[in-house]
Amino acid sequence: VLEQALENRSVGTGLFVPPGDSILLVNRFGQRFVNEHRNYNDRSRSHATFDPNRVEFPNEFQFMVYDQRIVETVGEQNGQPPIKPAESYVISGKTLSDLAQNIAARVEALAPRLGGYELDKSFAQNLKDTVQRFNEYAVAGHDADFGRGELPYDNAWQQLWALPTYTETHPANPHPNLSLHPLAAGGPYYAIILA
């Protein structure tokens, strides 16, 4: 969690694998770039992906986007830093547009400590498009971009560390791929910056 690391260079634990099923990672362009449930040794390498055409590391800082379902079903029971909205490093928005705007404001506030890092101008629109595409994959049960849920590890993590507590409001995932669940049609939505 970037903001924990900025406050204390020695954090108790990192966010090894995004917990839950209605959760995704986007880069500075608002686009997915990895199977979020890959093991942390493989997924963490995505931070260092270099784009020689743009001469940048587009995934250096990653935005973990999730919905209220994740807050209520996984919450603090994930063996990692808490993802509840009360945490100072959690960014929230009533809509995806609000969330994108609030992420941009947070990045702008942190930019002096991030070497002038900024979001691409396409971030807000791409975030909406990315969530829509992710939701379509979740309903279909197949992640055509990154194959999330096709490997045993993709589902094993949440069964060990992010064991959800389902409720009447947020029942068990009824979709064919247990590692994918559509983000809610309405907010609130949340994000945490990962480094």
Could you tell me what each predicted segment is?
Residues 1-195:
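Mobile, glycine/GP-rich and aromatic-enriched active-site lid/loop segments adjacent to catalytic centers
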